Structure formats: C-alpha cells, structure tokens
C-alpha cells in the first residue's frame, strides 16, 4: 500500500460534517488515485510551513512515512501573514528553508517529495477581471526550491488562475464557499468566502494537481487512475458524498 502524506492548510484539509459543504482538496484526491494508494491528510486550517513544523505535525509524518511513500508539500496562504509571527515566513529565506526541511524528511525515509504551489484565491477586481495574484513571491520561492532540490512541482497556482479566468466571477462561485443565504443548513446567512472550497472546486483543483503529477511522469504518474476509472469513481463520490477522511487514522 502506497501512502500520500499531505502537509498543507485549510484548502486541503479533511472537513467535518458541521462545516459542510466545505471540502478540502486532500479530502477528494483519492478520486484520482489507484486503489493501492491511501491519502493520509495532515493538512490543517491556518497552518504555514512554520506553524506546521512548530506544532509537531511534520514530526508525526516523520514517524510514519516510509520508503516508496509520497509527501505532498503545499503552503503559501498562511506563510504570507506578516502580522502573525507564529505563522509568517519570508518567501526567499525562511519559507524556502522550511520547504527544504519537509523535503529532507521525505528523502531520508526513501519517500518522494512533491511541491505544490498554493491555490489562487477568487480575487476578482470590479467583479470582472482576476486581480494580481496574492501568492506570487511564495510561488516563485517554491519554484526556486523545486529547481534547487530537484523536486517535481505541480503548479496549482498557475493552473487555478487559468481556470478562474475562464469561469469568470459568477462561474467560479460554485467552486468556493460563496453562496446565498438558505442554501446550506450550516450557513443559514450564506457565505462569501473566496478561499475555501466546495465539492466541485475541490474535485476540479485536485484534478489539476493530478495533471501535474501526470506531467512529472514515472512514479508520480503511476499513482493515478485511468480516465475511465476516474469517471466511475466520481459518480460514486457524488452519490455517497464522502465527507469523511480517507486516511487510515484521525490526523487531528
């Protein structure tokens, strides 16, 4: 059994019933993987590379990950919070240094690290045009780290910007926690959240990461199912609404 350990933030985390319809990318990623692949989702709301390490979450991965496993490293949203010293990292120094710590944890166990640039926010200007990206320095820093350390990179940031531009302000709302009052019991007053995802968004952006793995080839592409199998699995996901962790244990 191959395992994907995922270190990230709220855009990836597995959500509980009381926050439905919020859905993390890691929560649905097994839709794209073969049956012998398990996602162990350590992603947690509000975490940066710094706080993830400081809280011992990387240490827990260090204790569990093994040869032939994968470590997906996806940060940026919270590293940029300059007013919060518990989370902030400077993109071209401490952020890059922390990424290398994650990479080294994977490699010392014979596991495969993968860097994933942060998901773009729904940052439309005047309700028409997608604004300047919020994470550009962290994306550049992650790309530099990938090149320096010879680690494959799935550029979710660029791919998600492309999808947001194509869908437009109105069309992209269905992917995010952006909806009117009365649509969901957990949010009777509605929500205008341009960062966190609903099911359709999580599936879409998980698919973009899968595309990046396919392009990387080799052991990374070998994680993924064929297109025909994907369609069958997606029908099952929609039918069952699997808002529970696919991980073998609770990673809270």
Name each region found by the language model.
Residues 32, 212-216, 247:
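Active-site catalytic microenvironments for nucleophilic, acid-base chemistry
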Residues 243-250:
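Conserved small/polar residues in nucleotide/adenosyl-binding loops
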Residues 10, 48, 78:
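Gly/Ser/Thr-rich beta-alpha loop segments that engage phosphate groups in nucleotides
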Residues 48-56:
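Structural motif
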Residues 1-44, 59-67:
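Serine-esterase "nucleophile elbow" of acetyl-processing enzymes
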Residues 56-203, 207-226, 234-239:
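Alpha-helical cap/lid subdomain in secreted, periplasmic
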Residues 14, 49-50, 81, 124:
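Glycine/Thr-rich phosphate-binding loops of Rossmann-like dinucleotide-binding domains
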């Amino acid at each position: 059994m191959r395992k994907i350990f995922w270190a990230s933030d709220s855009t990836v985390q597995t959500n509980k019933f009381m926050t439905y319809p919020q859905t993390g990318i890691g929560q649905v990623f097994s839709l794209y993987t073969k049956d012998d692949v398990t996602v162990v989702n350590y992603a947690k709301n509000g975490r940066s590379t710094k706080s993830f390490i400081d809280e011992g979450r990387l240490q827990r991965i260090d204790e569990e990950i093994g040869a032939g496993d994968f470590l997906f490293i996806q940060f940026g949203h919270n590293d940029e919070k300059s007013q919060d010293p518990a989370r902030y990292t400077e993109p071209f120094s401490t952020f890059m240094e922390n990424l290398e710590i994650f990479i080294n944890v994977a490699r010392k166990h014979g596991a495969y690290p993968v860097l994933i640039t942060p998901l773009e926010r729904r940052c439309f200007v005047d309700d028409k045009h997608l604004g300047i990206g919020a994470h550009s320095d962290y994306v550049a820093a992650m790309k530099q780290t990938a090149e320096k350390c010879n680690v494959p990179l799935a550029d979710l940031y660029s791919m998600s910007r492309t999808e947001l531009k194509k869908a437009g302000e109105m069309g992209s709302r269905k992917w995010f926690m952006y909806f009117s009052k009365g649509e969901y019991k957990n949010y009777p007053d509605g929500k205008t959240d341009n960062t966190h995802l609903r099911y359709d968004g999580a599936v879409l952006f998980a698919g973009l990461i899968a595309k990046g793995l396919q392009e990387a080839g080799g052991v990374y592409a070998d994680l993924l199912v064929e297109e025909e199998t994907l369609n069958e699995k997606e029908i099952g996901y929609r039918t069952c609404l699997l808002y529970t962790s696919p991980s073998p244990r609770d990673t809270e």
